[in-house]
């Protein structure tokens, strides 16, 4: 199904349902439109790569509603990124977090040295916040690139 919706409570619930069901939605952020899905759903992640014809070596970012979600996702921001994040997020800043062993995101990448990392974004957009909060199990995932 493909449809353009105005943002209201009904469309937010619909987007959350699509994401929870493993589907994709296109959402606005403070900088670009992104393709969103559940970042724990490997099939949905695969679909983003397929739809965008994006090579698998290009990592995906996770869109968060709040910086304090990092710990619950099994992610840590090393110093000095934690201080920069406190100063510049929400906003157009995308730090790379370190994924702990308890991180279950399907979007985690490994460096050549084997360190597991994950790019994050906390957009400065009330609309994006409403969309990401509507999916309460886990915030939406976005690629940060045009579809």
Predicted regions and their residues:
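Active-site-adjacent structural elements in enzyme catalytic cores
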Residues: 1-145
């Amino acid at each position: 199904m493909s449809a353009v919706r105005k943002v209201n409570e009904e469309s937010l619930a619909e987007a959350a349902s699509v994401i929870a069901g493993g589907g994709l939605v296109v959402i606005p952020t403070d900088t670009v439109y992104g393709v969103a899905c559940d970042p724990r759903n490997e099939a949905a992640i695969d679909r983003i790569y397929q739809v965008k014809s994006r090579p698998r070596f290009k990592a995906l970012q996770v869109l968060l509603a709040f910086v304090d979600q990092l710990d619950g996702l099994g992610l840590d921001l090393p110093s000095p990124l934690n201080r920069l994040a406190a100063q510049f997020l929400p906003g157009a800043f995308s730090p790379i977090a370190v994924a702990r062993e308890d991180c279950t995101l399907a979007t985690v990448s490994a460096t050549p040295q084997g360190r597991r990392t994950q790019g994050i974004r906390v957009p400065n957009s009330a609309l994006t916040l409403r969309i990401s909060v509507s999916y309460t199990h886990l915030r939406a995932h976005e690629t940060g690139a045009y579809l």
